[in-house]
Swiss-Prot record:
This is Large ribosomal subunit protein uL18. The gene is rpl18. The keyword Ribosomal protein applies. PANTHER family: LARGE RIBOSOMAL SUBUNIT PROTEIN UL18, RIBOSOMAL PROTEIN L5-RELATED. This is one of the proteins that bind and probably mediate the attachment of the 5S RNA into the large ribosomal subunit, where it forms part of the central protuberance.
Length: 197
């Protein structure tokens, strides 16, 4: 476990893989408002927060379960379209709260091109929040779930048994996965009409 007399134990939250203290320190020094997307095995959680000595102040918050409860989302709550919609919802709420720009804080996630983290950020940018980030062109075709729809169509034609197994949760909720892009547009329009409330 230890490696001699000079071994230094890392902070608990760093050991648990929760906090990157070096990056957090730079945000605190710059007094930056942070756009914080987090992915779990089931959900996407997004918050817009700023530093305070007593603890971070939450300016805006969105959880992907809200998509199901408030807007009738029938897809998964942690896939790319759900990540985009959750980011869009958080972005709308942040803009309503008076935040114009924020810095993305992806924590200890490894940035991967076309990943869900960047789908969340793209959603916030499309909602009107300025978040400095590189090229998100690869996400254009993925945020509405067309890649999921194409795969579902392929499986439906080739292997019906595997299709029923992989997309059982979609079918159980009453959504044909081939129609996911249309359902995405419906939910996005509901969020726009509601104004992110």
């Amino acid at each position: 476990m230890t490696q001699g007399p000079n071994y230094r134990i890392k902070f608990r939250r760093r050991r648990e893989g929760k906090t990157d203290y070096y990056t957090r320190y730079t945000y605190v020094i710059n007094n930056a408002i942070r756009f914080v997307p987090r992915l779990t095995n089931k959900y996407v959680i997004v918050s817009v927060s700023k530093f305070d000595q007593k603890g971070d102040i939450m300016i805006a918050y969105a959880h992907s379960i809200e998509l199901v409860k408030k807007y009738g989302w029938k897809g998964d709550t942690n896939n790319t379209p759900a990540a985009y919609l959750t980011g869009y919802l958080a972005g709308l709420r942040a803009v309503k709260s008076g935040v114009k720009a924020a810095v993305s804080d992806i924590g200890l996630f490894v940035p991967v091109k076309g990943g869900r983290i960047f789908a969340v950020i793209k959603g916030a940018i499309d909602a009107g929040l300025k978040v400095p980030v590189g090229d998100l062109g690869k996400l254009k075709d993925r945020v509405n779930g067309s890649h999921i729809s194409a795969y579902a169509q392929k499986l439906k034609n080739e292997n019906q048994e595997l299709y029923n197994k992989l997309f059982s949760s979609y079918i159980q909720r009453g959504l044909d996965p081939v129609l996911l892009p249309q359902h995405f547009e419906e939910v996005l329009n509901k969020i726009k009409e509601n104004g992110g409330k």
